[in-house]
Amino acid sequence: RTHAMGVDEIRETVQAFADAAERADRAGFGAVQLHAAHGYLIHQFLSPLTNTRTDEYGGDFEGRTRFLKEVVAAVREVWPADKVLGIRISGSDWVEGGWSIEETVRLAQELQGQVHWFDLSSAGIGDTYEGPQGPGYQVPLATAVKEGTEGIVVSAVGSLTGAEEVAAVVDEDRADAVCVGRAALANPNWPTAAALALDVPSEQVPMARQYFRAKW
């Protein structure tokens, strides 16, 4: 049965994030990403649609972002400063009264200097989806955060599958990077195919070692 987390449970969970980051460091990972999107726990604290708490972890912006900020602080205690710490966040719930892009930009500004990377997705909370759809539909969220911050790498995601459209997002300075999911699942050699499609010099094309001799 679901229930609102008690303060002791919140503190235990914050520590669990830190413990996981410490294990990732020992395992040799060079980056970790906190998942604050798609209706998962951190997102549930951020969104007014799910966070109806009346204590210090609910209510206004400061209360609803407190859990994430405590997680970031705890992870930073154990995660090496020379390794990447990122956050994937739903930039908007796309539902009236939900978490908004304005709040996302404000949060990113407050976390400048504490995280290296913001990865902008959207939605995941609410019974309906009222947002846009189609290739690049979430890119404006990344652009808003990029324009509102300094010193943070901002990546865009969502229905970006073609080499030209991915390159355009970066070339036009709408985001610093693009995360490709479904296209990479369909073709694990997507980076190579994209580089060839964009006429990248062959010596710069990323190539799996087993394909090197054939150059494909």
Region locations from a protein language model:
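Flavin-dependent oxidoreductase catalytic cores
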Residues: 1-216
